[in-house]
């Protein structure tokens, strides 16, 4: 039988265990019952227990005669009648307490299962300890062992450790979502905002998106909307303009009622992600009525960019928003994450999800309030309004839509209409009206055979369309990057086919299948298969050999072609086809030029290069070349997992690692990757869609790039590749419809008419460049030289004679001509006209002689395979280190030229051979050029860059050093500052 002393001991233990406890009751219980239950069950439980036991003890004590009510008295006289009555009261009280506990536990379990649990804080000892009002938490937050508390470095560790504690309530399979696991960032006070304003760097003004005026200014409910200074300090002028533009569109400030979304169509590298994050954070925190305009936002992006978006938001906002990124998650995790995001009381503000994941779970977002702002990255994925992804996103009940795309115009105006209609439904009418009123007249007016009336009508409709869409489409070209990034040169390199490629190409285009295709016409899939086969042949005959061996239908035009291949060339022992010392490289013109270019880069520079192709089989050839020549390389294609891709990018960008080549599939990694560790990029084969090539080419000329950038586009001369590139220029011309860049109201005609598409299966073997022939260039003759007659040449010659020198008249944009030593060799046809756009090849520099190309590496690598080169130099801003190196290089070049002249004078004189060496040394020393101890220090690798006449003059060098000097010698008049 329990005694009062035992009850007292129980009460003391309960008092010493904790100072507070959390009492949970069901929200649907009656209020009076809840208060009574909490009061009797939590606050008064131990007190009533102790009180009754004390009374019984006191009673028994008085019966013994001492009346003290102490514990000893209760023990000695507990056996009498009155003591037995007290014991019964104690047992009854204990049973009542246990019954209350069981009932309260049952109610709490039911509340947990139903999801209507209410958490309250109650004091354990109300007479001694009182609990002030505070936020209810279900457990204590994780406390890191370090004294400095949370930081960016250990926050992820805290999340991982805290995530292990999961409570699954009885009768449920879903874990109980516990809030406030991590301490939230404190709200920014007014004092902090003042400090932020003061912390803005000099010259940077606050960015105010909207401020009340007139009656709104007098209304206290309206407050100004301005961007947090945490982000303002990093925004460039064009990015501030972009944030303001997007805010005006999505906030409804435009007068047009049909506009609630926008398309940010800036070129790659202009910071579309940062601009959208800035607007996202502003709308999550502010609004016209001092309340957030957006409560939930969804960011939809390609799968490969989900983790990149998560890292960018964390980087710029530093944990100020609650976000959830669903990347490579299981189906159960995706469902759980979406449900957590869509809960009415969820603290999550941003959901980052891939296009495929959203399409599969789009039905869950149909409820009202599921999304207040939609951001679609790489929005050219929405170019077809008949896809399931487009339909799923279009059904989302969200009017505020922001589309991010560096290439809004990809193939035709119909695809452009799909993106516009998704952003602002109905703003251009339905598809039938748009096709009849806009698309047909514009396309007809762009044809070379269009009449004057058709051209005028096309110009009018184009101007009308531009006026409408420019209200909610903002596009800036990457010319703005010249103020922030190093100079860039784009080179279109035309490479001849080898004898084997020529024989295979002629056999294919004259085959029965191709003739039947041209005369009768077949399915489009058959045409694309033949085009793909020819493009693979231009890359390397090995790809055709594999096609024939595998009996693939794509090689039907290459029947009986095995006789063209050397015996057992690709069928060596153990399946090896690398015999002959790597002679397989020379079977392709483009591959041969690439192999030489990689060799010169590896030996003479510390540059890194990105090789891009549309075919994984071509990437296999690149990898084989790198293995044979022991070049370190990294490969990223469709088979690379999402988590591994960012690691490969970081590995390539790490300057401490010995990386050289990055093999990239344009389909798998052409979007969003930042490969600033490399400053050279080769597009080995063209794509029908210019957007894919532009996306891939923008991987290296981005924020963070410190070196000069070289972009190479390899094309096989006279083949289908040149025709594909001309088609790209035609599509790029269409993009000006949304930019209003037609000067003097005149439309620029298509570079390729519809009839020209039938000329795909022809081969112009004897010309230097089919593109140059079609341009009908009046700056060059058939040999690529300056036209020798005409009034234009006479006036140009007069101006040339009036100038001081040819070098002074040449505007060397970016300094590429000076560092490559080709300035004195250039004529007017080799020089570009102004700063042309990337599709205006007529104004680029035209080079039939590779020695006039402002690129030292390409000069050395061209060989006999390069037939023609187009160059476009884009100005930029060099970092101070490279600027100093460039100045030192120019000084070195000047001294070297003077030294060569002095050597020539002495060699042509009658000075005896025994005295020439000493005389030459004295003269060079007077000029400041001393081979042994010169005041002009050459770079570490400058030994190979000395002129031919000075090679080997330093007698202290060993024979091995002399051999290596001859091996690494560069045929150039000046060294490239990238060599330093």
Curated annotation (Swiss-Prot):
Q: Tell me where in or outside the cell this protein is found.
A: Nucleus
Example of a GO biological process term: cell division
Renumbered to this chain, region (Disordered) spans: 1-106, 828-848, 950-980
What is the main EC category here?
hydrolase
The answer to keyword Transferase applying to this record is no
State the PROSITE patterns in the record. Answer: HELICASE_ATP_BIND_1, HELICASE_CTER
Biased composition, class Acidic residues, residue ranges: 15-50
**Record's keyword terms, sorted:** ATP-binding, Cell cycle, Cell division, DNA damage, DNA repair, DNA-binding, Helicase, Hydrolase, Mitosis, Nucleotide-binding, Nucleus
Primary subcellular site in the record, as a coarse category: nucleus
UniProt similarity note:
Belongs to the SNF2/RAD54 helicase family.
Complexes and interactors? Interacts with MUS81.
Q: What is this protein called?
A: DNA repair and recombination protein RAD54
- Phylogenetic classification of the source organism: Eukaryota, Viridiplantae, Streptophyta, Embryophyta, Tracheophyta
């Amino acid at each position: 039988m329990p005694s009062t002393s035992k009850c007292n001991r129980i009460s003391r233990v309960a008092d010493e265990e904790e100072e507070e406890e959390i009492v949970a009751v069901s929200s649907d219980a009656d209020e009076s019952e809840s208060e009574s239950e909490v009061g009797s069950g939590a606050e008064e439980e131990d007190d009533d227990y102790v009180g009754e036991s004390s009374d019984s003890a006191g009673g028994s004590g008085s019966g013994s005669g001492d009346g003290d009510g102490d514990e000893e008295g209760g023990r000695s006289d507990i056996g009498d009648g009155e003591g037995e009555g007290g014991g019964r009261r104690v047992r009854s009280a204990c049973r009542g307490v246990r019954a209350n506990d069981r009932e309260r536990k049952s109610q709490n379990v039911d509340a947990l299962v139903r999801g209507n649990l209410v958490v309250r804080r109650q004091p354990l000892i109300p007479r001694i300890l009182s609990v002030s009002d505070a936020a209810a938490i279900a457990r204590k937050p994780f406390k890191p062992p370090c004294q400095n508390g949370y930081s960016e470095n250990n926050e992820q560790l805290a999340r991982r450790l805290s995530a292990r504690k999961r409570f699954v309530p009885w009768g449920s399979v879903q874990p109980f979502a516990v809030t406030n696991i991590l301490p939230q960032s404190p709200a920014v006070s007014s004092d902090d905002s003042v400090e932020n304003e003061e912390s803005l760097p000099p010259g940077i003004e606050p960015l105010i998106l909207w401020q009340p005026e007139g009656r709104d200014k007098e209304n206290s409910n309206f407050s100004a909307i301005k961007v947090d200074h945490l982000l303002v300090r990093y925004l460039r002028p064009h990015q501030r303009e972009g944030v303001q533009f997007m805010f005006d569109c999505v906030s409804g400030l435009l007068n047009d009622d049909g506009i609630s979304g926008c398309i940010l169509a800036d070129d790659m590298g202009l910071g579309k992600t940062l601009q959208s994050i800035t607007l996202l954070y502003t709308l999550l925190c502010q609004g016209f009525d001092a309340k957030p305009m957006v409560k939930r936002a969804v960011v939809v992006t390609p799968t490969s960019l989900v983790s990149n978006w998560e890292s960018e938001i964390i980087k710029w906002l530093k944990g100020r928003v609650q976000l959830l990124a669903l990347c490579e998650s299981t189906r159960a995790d995706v469902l759980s994450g979406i449900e957590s995001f869509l809960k009415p009381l969820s603290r999550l503000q941003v959901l980052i999800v891939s296009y495929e994941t959203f399409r599969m779970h789009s039905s869950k977002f149909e409820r009202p309030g599921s999304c207040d702002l939609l951001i679609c990255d790489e929005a050219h994925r929405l170019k077809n309004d008949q896809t399931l992804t487009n339909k799923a996103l279009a059904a989302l009940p969200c009017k505020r839509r922001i589309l991010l795309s560096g290439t809004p115009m990809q193939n035709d105006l119909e695809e452009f209409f799909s993106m516009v209609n998704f952003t602002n439904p109905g703003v251009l009418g339905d598809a039938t009206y748009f096709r009849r009123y806009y698309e047909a007249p514009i396309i007809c007016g762009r044809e070379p055979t269009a009449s004057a009336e058709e051209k005028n009508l096309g110009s009018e409709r184009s101007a009308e369309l531009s006026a409408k869409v420019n209200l909610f489409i903002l596009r800036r070209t990457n010319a703005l990057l010249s103020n922030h990034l190093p100079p860039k040169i784009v080179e279109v390199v035309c490479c001849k086919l080898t004898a084997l490629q020529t024989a295979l190409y002629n056999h294919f285009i004259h085959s029965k299948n191709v003739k039947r295709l041209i005369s009768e016409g077949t399915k489009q899939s058959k045409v694309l298969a033949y085009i793909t086969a020819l493009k693979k042949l231009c890359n390397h005959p090995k790809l055709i050999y594999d096609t024939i061996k595998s009996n693939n239908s794509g090689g039907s035009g290459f029947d009986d072609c095995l006789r063209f291949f050397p015996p057992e060339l690709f069928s060596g022992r153990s399946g090896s086809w690398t015999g002959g010392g790597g002679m397989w490289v020379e079977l392709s013109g483009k591959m041969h030029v690439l192999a030489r270019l990689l060799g010169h880069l590896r030996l003479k520079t510390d540059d890194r290069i990105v090789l891009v192709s549309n075919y994984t089989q071509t990437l296999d050839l690149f990898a084989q070349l790198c293995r044979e020549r022991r070049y370190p390389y990294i490969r990223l294609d469709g088979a690379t997992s999402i988590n591994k891709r960012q690691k490969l990018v970081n590995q390539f960008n790490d300057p401490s690692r010995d990386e050289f080549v990055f093999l990239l599939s344009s389909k798998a990694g052409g979007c969003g990757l930042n490969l600033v560790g490399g400053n050279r990029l080769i597009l080995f084969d063209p794509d029908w869609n210019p957007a894919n090539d532009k996306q891939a080419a923008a991987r290296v000329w981005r924020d963070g790039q410190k070196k000069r950038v070289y972009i190479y586009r390899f094309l096989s001369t006279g083949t289908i590749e040149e025709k594909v590139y001309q088609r790209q220029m035609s599509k790029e011309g269409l993009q000006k419809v949304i930019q209003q860049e037609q000067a003097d109201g005149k439309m620029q005609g298509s570079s390729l008419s519809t009839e020209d598409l039938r000329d795909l299966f022809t081969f112009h073997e004897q010309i230097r460049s089919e593109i140059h022939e079609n341009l009908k260039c009046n700056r060059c003759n058939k040999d690529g030289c300056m036209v020798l007659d005409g009034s234009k040449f006479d006036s140009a010659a007069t101006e040339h004679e009036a100038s001081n020198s040819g070098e002074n008249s040449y505007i060397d944009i970016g300094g590429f001509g000076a560092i490559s030593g080709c300035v004195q060799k250039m004529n007017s046809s080799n020089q570009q006209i102004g700063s042309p756009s990337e599709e205006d090849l007529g104004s680029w520099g035209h080079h039939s002689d590779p020695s006039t190309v402002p690129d030292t590496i390409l000069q050395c690598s061209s060989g006999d395979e390069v037939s023609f080169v187009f160059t476009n130099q884009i100005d930029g801003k060099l970092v101070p280190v490279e600027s100093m190196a460039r100045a030192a290089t120019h000084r070195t070049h000047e001294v070297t030229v003077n030294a060569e002249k002095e050597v020539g004078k002495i060699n042509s004189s009658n000075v005896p051979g025994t005295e020439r060496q000493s005389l030459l040394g004295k003269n060079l020393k007077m000029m400041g050029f001393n081979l042994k101890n010169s005041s002009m220090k050459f770079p570490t690798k400058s030994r190979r860059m000395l002129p031919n006449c000075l090679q080997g003059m330093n007698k202290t060098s060993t024979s091995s050093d002399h051999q290596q000097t001859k091996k690494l010698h560069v045929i150039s008049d000046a060294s490239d500052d990238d060599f330093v």
